[in-house]
Amino acid sequence: MSVTTQEKDLSYKVKDLSQAEWGRQEIILAEKEMPGLMALRQEYKGKKPLAGARIAGSLHMTIQTAVLIETLTELGAEVRWSSCNIFSTQDHAAAAIAKAGIPVFAWKGETEEEYWWCIEQTIFFGDKGPNMILDDGGDLTAYIHEKYPKLLSEIRGISEETTTGVKSLYKLLKKGELKVPAFNVNDSVTKSKFDNLYGCRESLADGIKRATDVMLAGKVALVCGFGDVGKGSAASLRNFGARVIVTEIDPICALQASMEGYQVLRVEDIIEQVDIVVTATGNDDIITLEHMKAMKDGAILCNIGHFDTEIQMSRLNNEKGVTKKEIKPQVDKYTFPDGKSIIVLAEGRLVNLGCATGHPSFVMSCSFTNQVLAQIELYNNKYELGVYTLPKHLDEKVAALHLEQLGVRLTKLNQKQADYLGVPINGPFKPDHYRY
């Protein structure tokens, strides 16, 4: 499939519209596990706080994202959507959204050319452009800044989902190139400390096991990076009985890893001995071609950071004498001239979405509730140019919306106790500088 033309009136492009009913049934299941989004639908029922909003969205087109999209439309927004990764789309989810009449341009296994074509389609709302951006990774934001700068004057705000995209926002701001106020959704406590940590704790092992059927117990695994994603990834592998080793550049994160019982080494210290390597840094060139050549025969290599730059895939694919054989979609065996081979998952892209279905619905409800609140805040209030985080009371609100489903009963302060702590009786309970 190859698509290169602009089609301003195209309403959708998905792999198979006949999968819409399957997608719809899974969306209904997911709604039961996404109490935050469903609570916002109920809270704003009939109020339409996003009426008039034209949201260009670029975020993994999964079942959980379908619940987000339909929440945005129920709150009054007009939405056009693409995925932020060539492998992360769940085709039945995309089909269900297309069937519901919401413009979506996404399918699993896009080429790079098709990926950018899909992003282009999110920008056209008839003869108008978007007035809001909802992004994951920063590609849509960068695309509009670089290719359609004239549209930026109409855009009220950007909400960015992930660590990599947030880094890009701060870089643009520092260089004076960011032209639209933005919300850093990733650094909401109820996003980074839940999605990044608890989501990866469940979805990393799911992706590796679906792809390879490998038994993790007893294996030696290397996790590169011990931020929130790395912490969740290390726990994911350890919980299945793997012996986990961590690499880090940050002495604080390295000390945390050591205090959690992980050995902290450098890649070159251990690469020849490990069975599984996971990159989780958001950086470039973490695993080089030289590292791959040194890996054990049959070792598994994957990435759970946003982009495919953490592993030197281009060098691997262009190395003379190296052969590539597809075992199944997103599972490739690379054989070196000496006869040794390694297994690379999802072409070095997000393994949990490329080889499985990503994070569970409940934790994505936390993240996406933040997204909706950020969109409402940016659309209805004029912000000066800058990068903001959601205020503490909204962060606490997101958490509170998810407690009942888990059977949580919160202790309530009395006025004397609140006065003693110096906090409002109903919160916020922590200062902005508090580190959870």
Swiss-Prot record:
Binds 1 NAD(+) per subunit. It is an enzyme of class 3 (hydrolase). Its cofactor is NAD(+). One of its GO terms (cellular component) is cytosol. It catalyses: S-adenosyl-L-homocysteine + H2O = L-homocysteine + adenosine. Keywords: Cytoplasm, Hydrolase, NAD, One-carbon metabolism. It is found in: Cytoplasm. Pathway: Amino-acid biosynthesis; L-homocysteine biosynthesis; L-homocysteine from S-adenosyl-L-homocysteine: step 1/1. Pfam families: AdoHcyase, AdoHcyase_NAD. Substrate binds at T62, D136, E161, K191, D195. NAD(+) binds at residues 162-164, 196, 225-230, 248, 283, 304-306, 352. One of its GO terms (molecular function) is adenosylhomocysteinase activity. Its main location: cytoplasm. Its EC number is 3.13.2.1. HAMAP family: AdoHcyase. May play a key role in the regulation of the intracellular concentration of adenosylhomocysteine. Belongs to the adenosylhomocysteinase family. This is Adenosylhomocysteinase. It comes from Leptospira interrogans serogroup Icterohaemorrhagiae serovar Lai (strain 56601).
